[in-house]
C-alpha cells in the first residue's frame, strides 16, 4: 500500500507558491493565473470536504491512494474478466493503478469510508477544487484514469452497473464528476479568499482546469519546435516522460486501438486528438 495526505500536499503547494513569490521578488498582483498538475492518485473526502481515511490503519489524514498502489489487483482482474467495451479505451485491460478498481476495493474493504465519502478526486482535480471551491473535473484525469468516455462526453452507466459501482453515478455522478472540462479552461471565480490567503496571492486570480503531471510534460515535449523551427507533426512524434515512472506518449487525429497500450484517450492532452500511453 502507498498512501499520502491531501492536507500535507496542499500545505506543500502553498509553501512553494509563497517561496516562488519571495524568491522572484514580485508583487502578488503580477500573478495572472495558476495551473495545477499532479500524479493520478485517488483523493477521498467526506461530505464536508475533509480527509477520509483510505488506510487500514484508520488514520484520517491518510486519504490518498497513490497512483502506484496495487491493492486493487483482484478488483482489476474481476473487471477485466467482464470484457466491457469501456476496456477498449484502456488498451483492453484495466490496470490496478486506475481508479475504478481502487474504488471497488474501497467499497469492498472499507464500507465506513464508502458510506461517508462525499468526493472522490484525482489529485490534480483535488488541487483545483481546493484552490477555487469548483468541483469540475479535468477531461485528462477522467478519460485516462476514471473510464470517462470523452468522445461521448459521458460516463458509461452500463460499465459502472456491471462492475458494481452504479451508486457513483447517483445525483448526476456528483461524487466523481458532474462537470468535466478541457485542461486550461477557467474555473469558477478563480482563487478563493481562503486559498489566496494561504498562498499569499490575490483572491480571484485565474485558476485553470488541471492536467496529470506526465500529460503536462507530453504537451510541452510534443509541441516543441526544435532548433530548426519546424512545425510539430504530432502524428509522427512520441514523448518520453520520465519521473517516478516512465511513460511513452503519442497522440494522433484518429484513434489507435493497441492491445496492452493505454488509450486511445480522446482530448486527454490536446483537444480533438487521441492519446496512447
Predicted regions and their residues:
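Glycine-rich phosphate-binding/catalytic subdomain of phosphoryl-transfer
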Residues: 3-277
Amino acid at each position: 500500500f502507498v498512501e499520502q495526505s491531501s492536507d500535507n500536499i496542499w500545505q506543500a503547494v502553498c509553501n512553494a507558491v509563497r517561496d516562488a513569490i519571495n524568491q522572484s521578488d514580485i508583487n502578488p498582483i503580477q500573478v495572472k493565473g495558476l495551473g495545477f498538475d499532479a500524479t493520478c492518485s485517488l483523493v477521498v473526502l467526506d461530505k464536508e470536504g475533509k480527509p477520509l481515511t483510505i488506510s487500514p490503519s484508520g488514520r484520517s489524514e491518510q486519504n490518498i491512494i497513490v497512483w502506484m498502489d496495487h491493492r486493487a489487483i483482484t478488483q482489476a482482474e474481476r473487471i477485466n474478466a467482464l470484457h466491457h467495451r469501456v476496456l477498449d479505451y484502456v488498451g483492453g485491460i484495466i490496470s490496478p493503478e486506475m481508479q475504478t478498481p481502487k474504488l471497488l476495493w474501497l467499497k469492498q474493504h472499507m464500507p465506513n469510508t464508502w458510506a461517508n465519502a462525499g468526493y472522490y478526486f484525482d489529485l490534480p482535480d483535488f488541487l483545483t477544487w481546493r484552490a477555487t471551491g469548483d468541483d469540475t473535473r479535468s477531461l485528462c484525469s477522467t478519460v485516462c484514469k476514471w473510464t470517462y468516455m470523452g468522445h461521448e462526453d459521458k460516463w458509461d452507466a452500463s460499465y459502472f452497473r456491471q462492475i458494481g459501482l452504479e451508486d457513483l453515478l447517483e445525483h448526476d455522478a456528483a461524487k466523481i464528476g458532474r462537470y468535466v472540462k478541457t485542461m486550461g479552461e477557467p474555473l469558477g471565480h478563480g482563487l478563493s479568499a481562503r486559498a489566496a490567503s494561504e498562498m499569499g496571492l490575490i483572491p480571484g486570480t485565474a485558476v485553470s482546469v488541471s492536467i496529470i503531471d506526465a500529460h503536462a510534460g507530453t504537451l510541452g515535449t510534443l509541441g516543441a519546435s526544435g532548433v530548426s523551427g519546424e512545425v510539430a507533426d504530432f502524428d509522427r512524434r512520441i514523448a518520453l516522460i520520465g519521473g517516478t515512472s516512465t511513460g511513452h506518449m503519442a497522440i494522433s487525429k484518429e484513434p489507435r486501438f493497441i492491445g496492452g497500450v493505454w488509450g486511445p484517450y480522446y482530448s486527454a492532452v490536446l483537444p480533438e486528438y487521441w492519446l496512447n500511453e
